[in-house]
Amino acid sequence: MNYIFKTALFVAALALAAGGGKTGQNAETQDTAAVQQETGPHADNDLNREYVATLGGHRFEINIKRTADATLPAVSDELGSTFYDNRVEITATRDGEELFTKQFTKSDFADFVPAADSKGCVLLGMAFDQENSSAATLRFGAQIGQPGIEEGPAFIVEIPAGGGACSIVRDMRQDTMGEEGEQ
């Protein structure tokens, strides 16, 4: 009986020693893989939104495409992570005919935000505002902010449907900067 007990104990110890070595090696590999960090700037996912609206008897088709742009200056957040800034392209057609194609970057909004408030921020994106658009003027909302936080100064962008320069104003109703941004 004592012989069987000792043999069983020896086999169990051998099994633990053999399995324990592999587990330790696998655990080390898994820990190493989990600790490795990505190199280079981070980028937002590309975003493509399509809108269809009937305004003043005309059918408008609007495409808004956001892409991370490595040609724009990269920004760093409070933790030192680096991010590519985004470029947003808006294409609009009226009754099947191209109206305009415009590209926006964070610099288009620089006149409306103090440099200190836009530090570490990217152009988060833009969206079509159908409720406040008309056949004469298409209205969009835009926002800049820190990557991943999605808070920051908001803007109203109006583009004349007949062509011409767009207008940009700070949207204090949608602004998520808090009281500091309202001064």
Would you name each region that the model predicts?
Residues 99-102, 151-155, 166-167:
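Short beta-strand segments
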Residues 1-22:
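Sec-dependent bacterial lipoprotein signal peptides
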Residues 114-154, 160:
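Acidic, glycine-rich flexible loop segments
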Residues 163-183:
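Short, low-complexity, Pro/Ser/Thr/Gly-rich segments in the mature regions of secreted, periplasmic
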Residues 20-39:
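Short, low-complexity, disordered segments immediately C-terminal to signal peptides
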Residues 55-57, 94-96, 132-139, 162-163:
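Short, solvent-exposed coil/turn segments at beta-strand boundaries
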